[in-house]
Amino acid sequence: MSKLRFTTDHEWLRQDDDGLLTVGITAYAQDALGDVVFVQLPELGEHAAGSEVAVLESVKAASNILMPLDGEVVAINDALPDAPELVNQDPLGEAWFFRFRPADAGAWEKLLDQAAYDRLLNANADA
């Protein structure tokens, strides 16, 4: 599997061979949301880090997906709006949300690696 990085908002990012980053939510996030019933994907084009780019609705709550880094969204997962249950079934695979070209290729290194993300999850469990 390709190398993954994570955000404190429980999004995962995969660096693909073409230099693009693919984004989805972690198993922890989908578990916290419960059964996902609606997905609204981002518009193609430039988005600033931290901006709301997608929306998930579940039986428990609605949640915004934030743009993890400055960049240009170049592809969306057209399957998700018609099959939102994929988010629960395969959050780290088929349920990716979008692919984007980061404005700063070096920003990847500032994201959480697996060990740092695991520490975040453990801290949340202890809180």
Swiss-Prot record:
Modified residues (N6-lipoyllysine): K60
Cofactor: (R)-lipoate
UniProt remark on cofactor binding: Binds 1 lipoyl cofactor covalently.
PROSITE patterns: BIOTINYL_LIPOYL (PS50968)
InterPro entries: Biotin_lipoyl, GCV_H, GCV_H/Fam206, GCV_H_sub, Single_hybrid_motif
Biological process, per Gene Ontology: glycine decarboxylation via glycine cleavage system
Keyword terms, alphabetized: Lipoyl
Stored Gene3D superfamilies: 2.40.50.100
Record has Signal as a keyword: no
Disulfide bridges in this chain: none
Boundaries of every Lipoyl-binding domain copy: 20-101
Cellular component GO terms held in the UniProt record: cytosol; glycine cleavage complex
Subunit structure: The glycine cleavage system is composed of four proteins: P, T, L and H.
Family: Belongs to the GcvH family.
Protein task: The glycine cleavage system catalyzes the degradation of glycine. The H protein shuttles the methylamine group of glycine from the P protein to the T protein.
NCBIfam families: gcvH (TIGR00527), PRK01202.1 (NF002270)
PANTHER family, per the entry: GLYCINE CLEAVAGE SYSTEM H PROTEIN, GLYCINE CLEAVAGE SYSTEM H PROTEIN-RELATED
Protein name per UniProt: Glycine cleavage system H protein 1
